[in-house]
């Protein structure tokens, strides 16, 4: 059955990954050591999407954990679900990439990459019918960004026809973790545009906002943020793991969501998000889910879809929901917000239904949107990149690892092209093609 191999690279990737495994182990009724003690047969029916069954009724995640320093791995191993993972699947170096993309991509990471690929190969060989890969990483650091993109391109070479989904934490506008973030992110996007099939953009600041505004947490920890991300990750793949009337998988999602191959950067959202105290005061209904799902405050990337237009979007509902109600609500939303959808893709909302809700909820929905407003995010990083690159600040760290300035220039122009492509489709209208022909003869007459 359609298996997925999961990779997590770098500190951020490993922490999000750990939260993700915690979430789906819970959904499938597995405890911290991979032993099943759930209640429903449906939980076990398709555990093999993410888990291998070992001897003694133990389920082992099909996960490869990669980092260039042992610290984060030790933390995962010592965590509540540390005994879940196969010990051979921890692949780590000793040196660390020190937030340097070049170290992750060309020097330190390149030394470790074959070891990782061996593990990936072994996991892929154990699959009946491999659906694809998912990788969690950040774009601002060294290992997740540099080595993560290296792994993606290597896996792409070896498994060209399998889906490659990435959950990428993009640098946030106000909260910067490292000074060289714009460099690392631009170099990474340059790779992702070419090698990934779908990239779910997540950003820490938007997650902070959701935690403070919606969940009413006064000082959210990274644990809270990662929990939000894992809810979305679980939602995106829920159709693979549980039966439903209208299923979708990574490939169907990509076919429905990516109108042009380079434009595969998605915004994600999740509903219902309610603060811990307010849980008991609200009934979760389909209209409310749809409402909250399309709320700009609910998006996990810091770009406001009202500044752009949706090319396509997809909604995945979980729980006991009536098909008709969902269809009506989605149509309703599209009519209300018709200004924010491009009119040259009719019916651009895809819906999927899955009958099993996440733990502790009656129903929930996951939103994935391909909006042209994501260009704000790239534009912002691009501007910061240009400001630093013009002065050649911090460049010696990268050239010292054998990188060339040309690569930076290429990455910069690729990023700018991406922004322009989004802009072009945002401005496009249905009748454009016809108008062009009418105007051309007039131009000649004027001359």
Swiss-Prot record:
Pfam family membership, one: Tubulin
Cellular location(s): Cytoplasm, Cytoskeleton
Protein's UniProt keywords contain Transmembrane: no
Sites where the protein binds GTP: 11, 69, 138, 142-144, 204, 226
Positions contributing to Mg(2+) binding: 69
GO BP annotations, alphabetical order: microtubule-based process
Top-level taxon: Eukaryota
Quaternary organization: Dimer of alpha and beta chains. A typical microtubule is a hollow water-filled tube with an outer diameter of 25 nm and an inner diameter of 15 nM. Alpha-beta heterodimers associate head-to-tail to form protofilaments running lengthwise along the microtubule wall with the beta-tubulin subunit facing the microtubule plus end conferring a structural polarity. Microtubules usually have 13 protofilaments but different protofilament numbers can be found in some organisms and specialized cells.
Record-linked PANTHER family: TUBULIN (PTHR11588)
UniProt protein name: Tubulin beta chain
Source organism per UniProt: Uncinula necator
């Amino acid at each position: 059955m359609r298996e997925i191999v999961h990779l997590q690279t770098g500190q951020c990737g490993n922490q999000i990954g750990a939260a993700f495994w915690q979430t789906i182990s819970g959904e499938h009724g597995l405890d911290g050591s991979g032993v099943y003690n759930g209640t429903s047969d449906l939980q076990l029916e398709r555990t093999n999407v993410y888990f291998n069954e070992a001897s003694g009724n133990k389920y082992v995640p099909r996960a490869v954990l990669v980092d260039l320093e042992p610290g984060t791995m030790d933390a995962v191993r010592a965590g509540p679900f540390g005994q879940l993972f196969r010990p051979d699947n921890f692949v780590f170096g000793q040196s660390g990439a020190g937030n340097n993309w070049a170290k992750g991509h060309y020097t330190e990471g390149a030394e470790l990459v074959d070891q990782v690929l061996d593990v990936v190969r072994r996991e892929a060989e154990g699959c009946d019918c491999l659906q694809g890969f998912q990788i969690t990483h950040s774009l601002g650091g060294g290992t997740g960004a540099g080595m993560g993109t290296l792994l993606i391109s290597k896996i792409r070479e070896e498994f060209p026809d399998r889906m490659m989904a990435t959950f990428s934490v993009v640098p946030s506008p106000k909260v910067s973790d490292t000074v060289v973030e714009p460099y690392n992110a631009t170099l990474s996007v340059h790779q992702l545009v070419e090698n990934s099939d779908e990239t779910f953009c997540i950003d820490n600041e938007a997650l902070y906002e959701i935690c403070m505004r919606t969940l009413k947490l006064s000082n959210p920890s990274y644990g809270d943020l990662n929990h939000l991300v894992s809810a979305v990750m679980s939602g995106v793949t829920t159709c693979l793991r549980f039966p439903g009337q209208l299923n979708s998988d990574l490939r169907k999602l990509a076919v429905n969501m990516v109108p042009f191959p380079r434009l595969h950067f998605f915004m994600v959202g999740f509903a219902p998000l309610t603060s811990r105290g307010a849980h008991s005061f609200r009934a979760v209904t389909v209209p409310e889910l749809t409402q909250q799902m399309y709320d700009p405050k609910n998006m996990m990337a810091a770009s406001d879809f009202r500044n752009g237009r949706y090319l396509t979007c997809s909604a995945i509902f979980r729980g006991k929901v009536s098909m008709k109600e969902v269809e009506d609500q989605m149509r309703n939303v599209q009519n209300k917000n018709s200004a924010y959808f491009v009119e040259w893709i009719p019916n651009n909302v895809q819906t999927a239904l899955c009958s099993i809700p996440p733990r502790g909820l009656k129903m929930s929905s996951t939103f994935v949107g391909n909006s042209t407003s994501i260009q704000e995010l790239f534009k912002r990083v691009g501007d910061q990149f240009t400001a630093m690159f013009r002065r050649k600040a911090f460049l010696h760290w990268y050239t010292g690892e054998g990188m060339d300035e040309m690569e930076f220039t290429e990455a910069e122009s690729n990023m700018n092209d991406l922004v322009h492509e989004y802009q072009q489709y945002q401005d496009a209208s249905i009748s454009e093609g016809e108008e062009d022909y009418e105007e051309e003869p007039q131009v000649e007459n004027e001359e």
